């Protein structure tokens, strides 16, 4: 009898666990190459995770994988894949070809219908492999460029100069900033121009000739071409050389260090860079601490000397590049698959979208009941880590207006500028080609031309070197074939 009672008690205890087990959330692992600054050390402090769990019943866990692509290769071999997989550049095709990704086409019209409606007219081509959709598309809501030509307006006023709009005007204003004591301290201690670390300054110059200093695949007049082959490239290099060969014109450290520090210090009056480094509140505070009268304004792009659209900077505006995809194993686990769809569809609700952009309403942000506009609270900085959750990207202009209202004049300028749109993210190089080696060689030679270490008369020889040594001509042939296959109305 005692044995029977014991068995009944065990059975009752087991039954008591069934509802709890049934209520256990479905766990989805989202693999990440990096996590946002200030990422919570424990899930209990990750309010986005907690809110998604509360609203969907899904444990949506973002995890950092060190040495990401090498580790993913090992996971593929070991059949130990996360549910949502980060990729970049050609890895989307690599993973799809290795059959580790789920084709999304069967789910577009039903399970992912809310997502597709939210994405609007976003181009799906960059997220396809062999005509099938594998990558989760990112919202395309216009130009997301951050670059502009930033100029000391108070220096222009001191010297009675206008904001430059052409390459020649930019050069002349920069010369005046060197020679005419724009800060009024009686000392010749200023440079003409600086930029973001590397080539941003020289990209702005070259964009005045409808080109940029690197391997950028372009479409011009219905044909696939490359920035290196643009008719204005030699003119662009001549102007870059003119800038570098003028004494005190170019910040000597521009290739290795961003010009933000010398711009804030008052040592230069023109800065070609992305807007956050000079227009976010912390930067404005630093500028004011050095010189309360300093006033930086955004400008550009320069007039296109080749007759086309004025463009500021080379931008991958066609999509692709990096993103997330779903593991093929989800096709065999309906519960997990539906859990993923549930979270993705929550992402594109008003509540979900606001959560992953701004944080929790009432804690990190509030909405003005009259205007409907969102503003961040004093605790808004606690939501700075959440950008990694933005799998579908974000509504950029609205986001920037909420997060950085102090910089609206700068990001409005950069986002309304024309850009040099390139298509590299869609192209897979031919077998046997080492693209990274070619691009490294291109960069060294561009710098040699810019700084007078290689004569411009050798530019045609440089292109021949790319063809002979790096399969550049075959690469361009492949680019044309692939863009045609994607459905672009272009010819070789």
Task: Describe the predicted segments one by one.
Residues 9, 17, 23-492:
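Extracytoplasmic/secretory soluble proteins
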Residues 1-5:
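Positively charged n-region of N-terminal signal peptides that target proteins for export
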